[in-house]
Amino acid sequence: MATEGAAQLGNRVAGMVCSLWVLLLVSSVLALEEVLLDTTGETSEIGWLTYPPGGWDEVSVLDDQRRLTRTFEACHVAGAPPGTGQDNWLQTHFVERRGAQRAHIRLHFSVRACSSLGVSGGTCRETFTLYYRQAEEPDSPDSVSSWHLKRWTKVDTIAADESFPSSSSSSSSSSAAWAVGPHGAGQRAGLQLNVKERSFGPLTQRGFYVAFQDTGACLALVAVRLFSYTCPAVLRSFASFPETQASGAGGASLVAAVGTCVAHAEPEEDGVGGQAGGSPPRLHCNGEGKWMVAVGGCRCQPGYQPARGDKACQACPRGLYKASAGNAPCSPCPARSHAANPAAPVCPCLEGFYRASSDPPEAPCTGPPSAPQELWFEVQGSALMLHWRLPRELGGRGDLLFNVVCKECEGRQEPASGGGGTCRRCRDEVHFDPRQRGLTESRVLVGGLRAHVPYILEVQAVNGVSELSPDPPQAAAINVSTSHEVPSAVPVVHQVSRASNSITVSWPQPDQTNGNILDYQLRYYDQVEDESHSFTLTSETNTATVTQLSPGHIYGFQVRARTAAGHGPYGGKVYFQTLPQGELSSQLPERLSLVIGSILGALAFLLLAAITVLAVVFQRKRRGTGYTEQLQQYSSPGLGVKYYIDPSTYEDPCQAIRELAREVDPAYIKIEEVIGTGSFGEVRRGRLQPRGRREQTVAIQALWAGGAESLQMTFLGRAAVLGQFQHPNILRLEGVVTKSRPLMVLTEFMELGPLDSFLRQREGQFSSLQLVAMQRGVAAAMQYLSSFAFVHRSLSAHSVLVNSHLVCKVARLGHSPQGPSCLLRWAAPEVIAHGKHTTSSDVWSFGILMWEVMSYGERPYWDMSEQEVLNAIEQEFRLPPPPGCPPGLHLLMLDTWQKDRARRPHFDQLVAAFDKMIRKPDTLQACGDPGERPSQALLTPVALDFPCLDSPQAWLSAIGLECYQDNFSKFGLCTFSDVAQLSLEDLPALGITLAGHQKKLLHHIQLLQQHLRQQGSVEV
């Protein structure tokens, strides 16, 4: 039997050695195994320490190539006296950990079935135990304390998946059971070789020992391989990540590795807004030596483009450029530019061409314009209108402007000569309309020119790059002069006489008439009016009387003269006042004064009455008009659309409150205990009992004392928004207090508070249909709000309140998110990117609310950071179904999370879908047609860190079901193996009767089974 066992073992060893190399070759693509110890194929004596001596035997067996390999064997079952137990130890040499934080061990062994050994009683085992012990230095040769069990840490009890029977039941000692004989090779077919892998850590000391304890088995330890997992060095996203040891905690724990950007690359920008100079990229190494969870990355610098995928950045070739950092390829140089050197961030312009400071690097280079063409002018008295045509060459730009240079010369000059030393800049009296520089049209009115004086007018063409050119602007010039000159200004105006409704004025002739004066033009205006409301009259003499003036008013007067050459300039302004009405009446007969006084008194009375009537009518009309104008902003005539009024459009927000909310007398309010604190002040429970009505419980929010006026307007404005809506699933406004302090807003009292905290406190207590009914109520409220074109902007489970009848009501209407990252977990992609809130973005937020409801108030995206949430949304990852969530509901969530907002369902469609689920509950389990919607990747929640959980009680606390810790202890569920055996039928006996808790517990039991299956410590 010993010969047969050895032959069978050798045959299995040969096959497993080959398989090991294949497995290592495949897995090395993803992870590196750094070998710390390996006895596979060892032929010389290994010499591990055994205790007691002879408990384990080191022997050689033949493989199928007739080569010896060393094994350790223990088989003392049959030879042991009855009633005595076996305790045989085998210890490895000191193993250097070499930086490993966690060690993995792979065992190849074979175990004989106790039934084949003919041993009765409980002394036979088919298992052995694995231990490890850390040490800073190897043990001294005479050390015996290493066998004390307290110094060792148990890794696991190793059980064989397959044990094999003995071909001869007469031998069960170690030497007989595993002896190598000349005929062994032909007797190895029945030998069963097991492979088990375990890990232990974290390792903190220089090295460690591994020990194997046999307590009565007949086994052969064929090969022992100790190794650690290492994530290989990798190039990814233009960053190099070093070889990184896996975490010592194992499992789902991660070790962050900081990457280094490859040459000519830089970290990507941080945050939503894109801050330059971002954080270095990070990649995480998991416990199995595999890279995962990339955070950030690098991008090629300006002048460099991606090469070899995302492994390197290479310089842009000559003639190409890249202006900004990123992973886009280089681009050909724009027109009239060229990059003579590689790695160009911008293409320099060719000679004679330029880029303005406002031009982007991708803009073509441009040049200054050529000179204007075909200058000509039209004389208009002492002024002239100068015209020209556009330049033949605009330089490739559209920002063409013109400047006019005026020179006054002595004698006849040629435009091209510039006048030499006989020309000078024009006098200040010469003016240009509309202006002298920066003209956009090809004409200008030049005034203030003297007659018979030669001028040179030069028109320059300029654009955005003219200042960059070393040459002066291209210009065209023309000689001009006027043959006639208008009169100079009238120097002064005198008052001759005045009355209550008229003034008579006179003036002298201009100092320089420059010809015969044909007439004068008098301009006058009331000082209380704008000068643009002036009147004119013409007089052929130097005297004029202005009539139909108002008594006691001050008027301004100006006069100008006209000759055949045209009007001269106006003189300076002078002011005269008409007589008051009282002074005029004193010169009239007494009777006439009485008549006029009576008439004026009657007129005054009638005027006062008319003003009073008009004021009342206007005020009423203003109220109605203001209200109507607000409505018209949101109406579509003829379509029967409901209206919503934005209180911020009122000039006086208090007017909006008076029209849209009901004022409550504070005497009817009884304030009780504080139930919370809002953004404006304390929220209290109270009672409201208006006269003639029954008492009702209300929530009262009072504004903080001393709040700024803007805060008061915001506080009342939100109440004005809420007061416009009447729906059973929208929080009802009971009234406001604005005529006394403090300002107060009264709403119906919602006993159970926000929906998210309500669900967290009652996890697992509702059926799926009850949760659907809650969501249906919120959807109905949002359908009602969308019919008013109202966008909520901050919809979440926290903004929904629950009353004692489990009715959900939408609240926080008119609350705008504060800051770019506020409510990011509920925000649609277009809101994050552009701040664009629509009813479609409310649909997205409602889908997140659905997920919150089905997960009993779980935080969306769990503990992911804001940046990780943003990256996940941009990469089109979506939340997975919560535990126990019916497939039909999760499909509805995915519909609300369509990236294209036009493809998201409307709220009326969501209400119809919920109604169908309530009428036909089997539709909750419908998976839908996979082709009807795009496939979306689902996020996975962060897994439990099982190595950190030392008991089922800690596990229950980690999954939020610590209320059942006493139940587990009472029924003796003290190990994870016991918990892993639980099924749905066992839960009621444990006192777990809530359907939601049962679903959650079974979900985590499945995860526990997967973990234990990987560890190989339980049969599930």
UniProtKB/Swiss-Prot annotation:
One of its GO terms (biological process) is axon guidance. It holds the Pfam family EphA2_TM. A motif (PDZ-binding) lies at residues 1018-1020. SUPFAM superfamilies: Fibronectin type III, Galactose-binding domain-like, Growth factor receptor domain, Protein kinase-like (PK-like), SAM/Pointed domain. Residues 669-918 form the Protein kinase domain. The keyword Membrane applies. Ligand-binding increases phosphorylation on tyrosine residues. Phosphorylation on tyrosine residues is mediated by transphosphorylation by the catalytically active EPHB1 in a ligand-independent manner. Tyrosine phosphorylation of the receptor may act as a switch on the functional transition from cell adhesion/attraction to de-adhesion/repulsion. It comes from the Eukaryota. It is a single-pass type I membrane protein. Residues 947-1011 form the SAM domain. Belongs to the protein kinase superfamily. Tyr protein kinase family. Ephrin receptor subfamily. This is Ephrin type-B receptor 6. It comes from Pan troglodytes (Chimpanzee).
